[in-house]
């Protein structure tokens, strides 16, 4: 909905950015593409409309860091938001804490942490964990989470670090009601969060083995190449 010019603006800019990025050889981690996106952010900052960002935390952080290092500090229109999902993947060793990310976003774009929304989930576990006002991933009623000991796989109590095990009865197509992730996490009691949601929440603290981490797409690409040999 809204002003038709707004919709056309997004379509035109999106097509232009995709065309430019597709024509670049770039380095493997996509930082050349990020430089192109930074140009577009600067251009969009002159618009009368708010800007909405959707993407991986890692690449969003890299773009903000580039802008900060170059002294590019903008004040985007009210209503601008950042929506994050997908984790840090193979850039996990460069991950920064949330407070550092929020301060950088406010300094570079003028977007406060209340307008930064993050999602957590897994391809094999079709339940979306949306962060609350205090950026905690509360467990929805149609999902469950266990923290398991990394050696024995025994369930752990609140406050203990272990492997994150996600469960839901909402999967019908394949027998994957229980998914063991490679995320290290802590389960916190919901009452400790001031947002009012009493459901327990997940705090992601790391990943098991930072070497050879691949995205889902990269893993699928390798499997296809092997199958075609």
Task: For every predicted segment, state its role.
Residues 2-229:
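Active-site glycine/GP-rich loop and adjacent strand/helix microenvironment
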